[in-house]
Structures are given as structure tokens and as C-alpha cells.
């Protein structure tokens, strides 16, 4: 085991504080509408330019191990906030730094760190309750667009696009952000359920121009095993032919004789049909087939349930108004499933999302949820250069997360104003002077985001904060973008409560740990061994002529 370097008390805290300051100073320049960019060197390719706090925080790695520990703990504030709320990482970092700085001063003055932490926790709980009480619910598409615009650093086009996407796929719907191949940013909405499996044979195509198979008012047969022989299916195929409706077969695979028979029947015009492979693998495939069955009002034909192919009747098949199948994707629009059953399935998947510990499983469950709940929207971010596209994509991701958070818990006045107002409403009382000091630390620290936003805009923070607090209106504040005072909610300068709340709770949690740290242990750097001496020259080489 390698030797360790141990630092105690004030020396440890000073080192840690230096690390916190380096990381926070790099992150906080990005805060607000007039925040600056940070350029990050990449080991290959062009440098990355970003205004995303968590992206900056993740790049900071310091040489001094003790300073690095402080920086990494503050980085945890940004990462945790990003995981929970998806935005507010810079605000969280600024709050974390402010609480640590104030706390370190109090500890240096001889106060008890544990009591300080208790005081900080008391005040934070009160501020969170105040924020939730003041939250205004979001109802209109315009309000959704405002939240998106603020988080995308004032880019109204992005805000509008997110609002439109949410309107089309619902708040539960999946909205993904991708890099576009063009300079334009565009929105594409896929209604209904789409999965990434295309037709098994190009002979199923009904529209040769677009190379897609469109089935109107179709029956859907869902089978969890391979189909290599159609003998067992003949009764149901004949029943479908009688109705003159098209049929889509979704099975693990359709191969050999079965596929050939379907293609021949399709070409002869006797049967409007298409076949695709079932989406997913293993247990996930079973679950997705069950989802499609519920969405279309059909049944999965499964040996496990004791249903044999020979006994399948028309009422076991799903129905959909339209099915569109391309080379890569199948989209089922307007399935005939019962709303109550779909809602029950959605509830079941939500429960699984809450219980799962795997990020991958959670992502897959959310995809399934979206497909059932209404569709998928894709925002393709365009730009003139790759660097610009990456920077813009960061902002769109933040804006999307902020918008979701706003729909969930509501909004408050933006620009750090909600926390500024809350600082005057803290009434908590500590049981001793040190706890009181902890409460006062939060009073001062939660003014930091508003001060930083105005400082980044080149304004005098104390003057502006003073003027905002003189006015008693909850929503009165300063619009840094144009340098005017006014009602922030009606100006559309708003923050999601969830983002502000999460930022404060995470900042206070990690800052409390940093303040109460008394010893730090790091591995000593290994001393390089002296290089071995050069071997002696070969004997008898002297006096040779070259």
C-alpha cells in the first residue's frame, strides 16, 4: 500500500477551499444571459466551446491532490443537480461556493462546524418550502416556450421548438436531441408507436416511390416465436382475406417457406400483407410485444399463455388505423386499444422506472413509456460548424430538461430573484449562536446567483440587489438582457422551481460536508527511482581507427 499524506484542520480546509474556488470560478462565468463561454481543450479535434456548467465542471482536474478533492466534491454538486433536474448546474456551483466560503470563515472564527451545518440545513428546508409555496403552475404553451428560451440563453427559436414538441407528444413523450446534417435546426414528430424494425422483404412495399409499405385500417398479428411455416396460420389468414383488410405480422422472425408464401400472395394481390421482426431482445422483446398488444387491442400469441397459432381468431388480432413500414422503422398510428388498459400499462412502466437502479434500463423503460403515451419528437440541432452544433446542443439539452422540470413543479421569478426574496423570509431560529450563524450563512449565500448574474453582465451587483429588495412585489426583478426592471414572470424571465430547489439542496449538502471536514488523506506522489548507470564500454576497443 502506498504511503499517504495527511493534512489536518485549517491547512486541509484552505487547500480544499482553493480547489472549490478554482472550479467555481471557471463555472460561474457562464451564468446568466450575458454569461461568457468557456473553451475546453480536447485531446483530438477542435476545442469545445460551452456555456453548460456541468460540462465545464467535469473537465476540471487539479494537480494538487488536496485541492483536487475540494474541486471534485463541488463537481458532485453540479453532476447531481444535472442528474435530478437536468439544468441549474451553474447556479448549484455558485451556491456551493458561497456556502463553503462563508462556512470556512465561521469555522476559522472558532465556531462549531456541526452546529453550523445544522443551522444551514434548517434554513435550506425553510427556503425550499417557501419556493414550493410561491411556485406558479405552467398551463400554456407560451409559458413552456419562455422557460425553454431562458435556459437556452435567450434563444427564442429553441424555446418555441421545445414547446411545440411537448404539445405534440405530451409531457410524458420522449423528446430527443440530435445533431443535424444541415445548418438549420428542425423538429420532427413521430406520432403513434415507432420501433426500429423494417419490412422483411421489399416486395411488401406499397409505395415504390418512397419505398414504404402503408397499411390502412390493418389487423396486427403478434407472435413471440419464429414463423417458418404458415400451415397453422391458414385459418386466420383466410378470415382476414374475407374482411379485405390488410394484415401486419410482427414475430421474432418470418423466414423460409412462410416468407415466400406471404410474398407470393402479396404479389398476386390476394392478400394485403407485410411482416416485420419484433423489436428488442429477450425479456424486453416480450414486454414490447405486450405494449403493442395493449396499444392495438390485440393479444400476443404465446405458447406460455397456452395460445396456439391454429386457434387464433380475428378478435385476438390488434387493430390500427394506419401502419407505415419503411426499410428501417415501423410506425403504428391510432391503435384500437382501450384507454383504461393503456393508462394502466403506463402506470406500471412508471413504477418500474422508479424502482430500477440501472440507467440503461431506465432509458429503455422511458422509451417504452413514450411510445405508449403519445409519440416521439426529435429536435435536430444545426449549425455552421461542428463546434457550434455541439455548443448549441448543450443549450437545447438544458432547455429541454428545464422545461420538463417546470411542467413538473411550476416556476418562480428567474434571474436568482426567487432565492433573493427567500433570503429575507427566513425566520428559523437556531438553539445556539453557532446554529444562528449557519442560518445567516444561507441568508447571505442564496443572494450569490443574482449577484453573479449581474456581475457577469458588467453591472454593480450591490446596487441592483438593493433596488430589487426595496420593492415588495414577489416577481419584481432586473432583466439583465436589456438592463430594465420589471415584473419578471410577465417578461418571461422564469426559473423552474425544481431546478432552483435541487441546486440549493445539493449545494448545501456538499458544502455542509466540506465545512465539517477536519482531516484529508491523499496518496503521496511516487518518487522516481534514479536511472541505472550506463554500462561500461567494451574492453579492448581503445586505439581502434575508424
Swiss-Prot record:
InterPro entries: Chaperonin_Cpn60_CS (IPR018370), Cpn60/GroEL (IPR001844), Cpn60/GroEL/TCP-1 (IPR002423), GroEL-like_apical_dom_sf (IPR027409), GROEL-like_equatorial_sf (IPR027413), TCP-1-like_intermed_sf (IPR027410)
Assigned EC number: 5.6.1.7
Catalytic activity: ATP + H2O + a folded polypeptide = ADP + phosphate + an unfolded polypeptide
Subcellular localization: Cytoplasm
GO molecular function, one term: ATP-dependent protein folding chaperone
Gene3D superfamilies for the chain: GroEL, GroEL-like equatorial domain, TCP-1-like chaperonin intermediate domain
Primary location class: cytoplasm
Protein family: Belongs to the chaperonin (HSP60) family.
Record's protein name: Chaperonin GroEL
Organism: Brucella abortus (strain S19)
Name of the encoding gene: groEL
Amino acid at each position: 500500500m502506498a504511503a499517504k499524506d495527511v493534512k489536518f484542520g485549517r491547512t486541509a480546509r484552505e487547500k480544499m477551499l482553493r480547489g472549490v474556488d478554482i472550479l467555481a470560478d471557471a463555472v460561474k462565468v457562464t451564468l446568466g444571459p450575458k454569461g461568457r463561454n468557456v473553451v475546453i481543450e480536447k485531446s483530438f479535434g477542435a476545442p469545445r466551446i460551452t456555456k453548460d456548467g456541468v460540462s465545464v465542471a467535469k473537465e476540471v482536474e487539479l494537480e494538487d491532490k488536496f485541492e483536487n478533492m475540494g474541486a471534485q466534491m463541488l463537481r458532485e454538486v453540479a453532476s447531481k443537480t444535472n442528474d435530478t433536474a437536468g439544468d441549474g448546474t451553474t447556479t448549484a456551483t455558485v451556491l456551493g461556493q458561497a456556502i463553503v466560503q462563508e462556512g470556512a470563515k465561521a469555522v476559522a472564527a472558532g465556531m462549531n462546524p456541526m452546529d453550523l451545518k445544522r443551522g444551514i440545513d434548517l434554513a435550506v428546508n425553510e427556503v425550499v418550502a417557501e419556493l414550493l409555496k410561491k411556485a406558479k403552475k405552467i398551463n400554456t404553451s407560451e409559458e413552456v416556450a419562455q422557460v425553454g428560451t431562458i435556459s437556452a440563453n435567450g434563444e427564442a427559436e429553441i424555446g418555441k421548438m421545445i414547446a411545440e414538441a411537448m404539445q405534440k407528444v405530451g409531457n410524458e413523450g420522449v423528446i430527443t436531441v440530435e445533431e443535424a446534417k444541415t445548418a438549420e435546426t428542425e423538429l420532427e414528430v413521430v406520432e403513434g408507436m415507432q420501433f426500429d424494425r423494417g419490412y422483411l422483404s421489399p416486395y411488401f412495399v406499397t409505395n415504390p416511390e418512397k419505398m414504404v409499405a402503408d397499411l390502412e385500417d390493418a389487423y396486427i398479428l403478434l407472435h413471440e416465436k419464429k414463423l417458418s411455416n404458415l400451415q397453422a396460420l391458414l385459418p386466420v389468414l383466410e378470415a382476414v382475406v374475407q374482411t379485405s383488410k390488410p394484415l401486419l405480422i410482427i414475430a421474432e422472425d418470418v423466414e423460409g417457406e412462410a416468407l415466400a408464401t406471404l410474398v407470393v400472395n402479396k404479389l398476386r394481390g390476394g392478400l394485403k400483407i407485410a411482416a416485420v421482426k419484433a423489436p428488442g431482445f429477450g425479456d424486453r422483446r416480450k414486454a414490447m410485444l405486450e405494449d403493442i398488444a395493449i396499444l392495438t387491442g390485440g393479444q400476443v400469441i404465446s405458447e406460455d399463455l397456452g395460445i396456439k397459432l391454429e386457434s387464433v381468431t380475428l378478435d385476438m388480432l390488434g387493430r390500427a388505423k394506419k401502419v407505415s413500414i419503411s426499410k428501417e422503422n415501423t410506425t403504428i398510428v391510432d391503435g384500437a386499444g382501450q384507454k383504461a388498459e393503456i393508462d394502466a400499462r403506463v402506470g406500471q412502466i412508471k413504477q418500474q422506472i422508479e424502482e430500477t437502479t440501472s440507467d440503461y434500463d431506465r432509458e429503455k423503460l422511458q422509451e417504452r413509456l413514450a411510445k405508449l403515451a403519445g409519440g416521439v419528437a426529435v429536435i435536430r440541432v444545426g449549425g455552421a460548424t461542428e463546434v457550434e452544433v455541439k455548443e448549441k446542443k448543450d443549450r437545447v439539452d438544458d432547455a429541454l430538461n428545464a422545461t420538463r422540470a417546470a411542467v413538473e413543479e411550476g416556476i418562480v421569478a428567474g434571474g436568482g430573484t426567487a432565492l433573493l426574496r427567500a433570503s429575507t423570509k427566513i425566520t428559523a431560529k437556531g438553539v445556539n449562536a453557532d446554529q444562528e450563524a449557519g442560518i445567516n450563512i444561507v441568508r447571505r449565500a442564496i443572494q450569490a446567483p443574482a449577484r453573479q448574474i449581474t456581475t457577469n453582465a458588467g453591472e454593480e451587483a450591490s446596487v441592483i440587489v438593493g433596488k430589487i429588495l426595496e420593492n415588495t412585489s414577489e416577481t419584481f426583478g432586473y432583466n439583465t438582457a436589456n438592463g430594465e426592471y420589471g415584473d419578471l414572470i410577465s417578461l418571461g424571465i422564469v426559473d423552474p422551481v425544481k431546478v432552483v430547489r435541487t441546486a440549493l439542496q445539493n449545494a448545501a449538502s456538499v458544502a455542509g460536508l466540506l465545512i465539517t471536514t477536519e482531516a484529508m488523506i491523499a496518496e503521496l506522489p511516487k518518487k522516481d527511482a534514479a536511472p541505472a548507470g550506463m554500462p561500461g564500454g567494451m574492453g579492448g576497443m581503445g586505439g581502434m581507427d575508424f
